[in-house]
Design a protein with these regions (language model features):
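Basic, Lys/Arg- and aromatic-enriched nucleic-acid-binding interface segment
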Residues: 134-175
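Non-catalytic DNA-binding core/recognition domains of DNA-processing enzymes
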Residues: 13-105, 264, 280-284
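Active-site/catalytic core of tyrosine-dependent DNA strand-transfer enzymes
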Residues: 222-282, 286, 291
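N-terminal DNA-binding module of tyrosine recombinases/phage integrases
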Residues: 1-14
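Flexible interdomain linker/hinge and immediately adjacent N-terminus
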Residues: 94-146
Length: 293
């Protein structure tokens, strides 16, 4: 690990102490990738927000260089950029420019989700919700005999993917599960509004645990939404928490939004014969099923 990487990761850790090193490392690598793609020597280029935003808008896809970068990929660039600048206490006016761009892309994403419309590009990865549920059942049956044994890393990875899919077919959010923090009701009452605004939570309470979603809106439209977790899903999540020995305050899905996407894409690709499901496609399958009648 270079001195630069250590210094940046330490500053982000101090700014967001609840983030685990693996998540911060992912953010750093996203920043480094942007720096390399724009052929810059350091991160000072980020201080020229107008020029950087213009260059990001011209970036092309890694998989298909003839296509511009998808808007969700651009959004995922802005999140670590904003976090980095906040952690280093940089000019708030510069940060605001990046936040405006990110929020535009968030709004674009939300508008697409409300329509449930499937683009030609997404069509090849569209599956009916029943097929997703069958996939989840296959995962469940594969996991069942392993839950009472010493699970290896591959088993734990499958449990993580299974738990994510079980949540997403009931709560078809965006990638807001990334960085989800486990917390008790008493501790949740003590956290500041600023902390609530920048994180999403699973609150373990009686008689019902519940999710608190805070990152799905722009600052101007900010509000908090709580959703009770059904008992059958709560049991699945509790199993995941117990096996991983998570405690209050821990991040139970310790990966970036891009990391979450990769988990879903890889797992679904294996169980659906190469069809790869993102949170977007799960949501579209959910909406298609819900409003098909």
């Amino acid at each position: 690990m270079t001195t630069e990487q250590t210094d940046i990761m330490d500053k982000i850790q101090s700014f967001r102490p609840h983030l685990k090193p693996s998540t911060i490392k992912q953010y750093y690598h996203q920043l480094k990738k942007l720096q390399m793609r724009l052929k810059e020597n350091d991160f000072e280029f980020l201080m020229n927000a107008d020029d950087t935003i213009q260059k990001i808008n011209k970036l092309t896809s890694d998989k298909n260089p003839s296509e511009l970068l998808h808007f969700t990929s651009k959004r995922n660039i802005y999140n670590p950029v904003i976090l980095y600048l906040l952690a280093l206490d940089k000019d708030k006016n510069v940060i605001k420019k990046y936040e405006v761009e990110r929020d535009k892309l968030n709004n674009q994403y939300q508008d697409e989700q409300l329509t449930g419309k499937i683009s030609s590009k997404q069509g090849k990865n569209f599956v009916h919700i029943d097929d997703i549920i069958k996939m989840i059942t296959t995962m469940k049956n594969e996991l069942k005999p392993k839950l009472k044994t010493n699970m290896n890393a591959r088993d734990i990875a499958l449990l993580k993917a299974y738990t994510l899919f079980e949540i997403l077919v009931r709560f078809p959010t965006r990638n807001d599960l990334a960085g989800l923090q486990l917390i008790t009701p008493s501790k949740f009452k003590k956290i500041t509004e600023e902390e609530k605004k920048n994180n999403n939570y699973i609150v373990r309470a009686k008689p019902n645990s519940y999710f608190v979603w805070n990152e799905f809106k722009t600052d101007k439209k900010y509000q908090s939404i709580s959703e009770n977790i059904p008992k059958d899903l709560e049991k699945i999540i509790n199993t995941y928490i117990k096996i991983n020995n998570y405690k209050s305050g821990d991040i139970i899905f310790d990966f970036s939004r891009n990391g979450l996407s990769q988990i879903l894409l890889n797992a679904s690709g294996k169980y659906l014969g190469g069809i790869q499901l993102s949170t977007t496609m799960i949501r579209k399958s959910y909406l298609s099923s819900k409003y098909s009648d």
